[in-house]
A protein has these predicted regions:
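Short, low-complexity N-terminal intrinsically disordered segments enriched in polar/charged residues
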Residues: 23-66
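Short, charged, low-hydrophobicity "junction" segments
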Residues: 20-26, 105-116
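Intrinsically disordered and other compositionally biased segments
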Residues: 6-10, 71, 193
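Bacterial Sec-dependent N-terminal signal peptides
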Residues: 1-30
Length: 193
């Protein structure tokens, strides 16, 4: 098992081990919140890597499809990704899978996508339905270049909605509650050269 998968499994186990304590309390303890925040930021960083792989023109289609499947698992159902461009005021929103497919099919010979300055801009807040919602901001640097000299570059500031909710699973015949983190809509807030 790869180190990353082991870490993810250990993180999940850690979240599940505290489920009994969490089930007794309505609020998330500061220690648990810190673990949830770390998991949320890890999922955002994973998405950053997946987007770079999907957009890379050297990635085989079969590999890109596999990575799209993995990336989709990070999101809550119905989530959308905003897409902007310099010289166009409107932001267009696509369902997550459609965004990945369009990214993979961009008409450039070389594409580089880097995310940086990833941080929370709002604390997790409890919602009436019992889940918690927060927002993570990222900056995305996009560079596309064609062999015929066509070049496009922009930097986009994006806000990612983070959902944290209690879920249940069966482990050795026992029902165990745990906190899960899912990504939601990714909204464009600013696009610059």
């Amino acid at each position: 098992m790869k180190l990353k998968n082991k870490f993810a499994l250990l993180s999940l186990c850690g979240l599940m081990l505290s489920a009994n304590l969490m089930a007794q309390a309505d609020d998330v303890s500061p220690q648990r919140k810190q673990a949830i925040d770390s998991l949320a930021l890890e999922k955002v960083r994973d998405l950053s890597k997946y987007i770079s792989i999907i957009g890379n023109k050297k990635t085989a289609f079969s590999e890109a499809s596999r990575v799209m499947d993995r990336a989709e698992e990070l999101f809550a159902p119905g989530s959308e990704m905003g897409v902007s461009a310099l010289g166009r005021e409107a932001v267009i929103y696509f369902p997550i899978r459609k965004y990945f497919e369009r990214l993979n099919a961009l008409n450039y010979d070389r594409v580089t996508i880097k995310w940086y300055n990833i941080h929370y801009i709002s604390d997790l807040e409890r919602q009436p339905d019992g889940r918690y919602v927060g927002v993570v901001t990222i900056y995305q640097r996009f560079e596309g270049e064609s062999d015929d000299g066509l070049k496009y570059k922009d930097t986009t500031k994006k806000d990612i909605t983070i959902y944290v909710e209690r879920k249940k699973t069966q482990i050795e015949g026992r029902t165990v509650e745990f906190w899960d983190v899912l990504l939601g809509d990714i909204r464009v807030t600013e696009t610059t050269a």
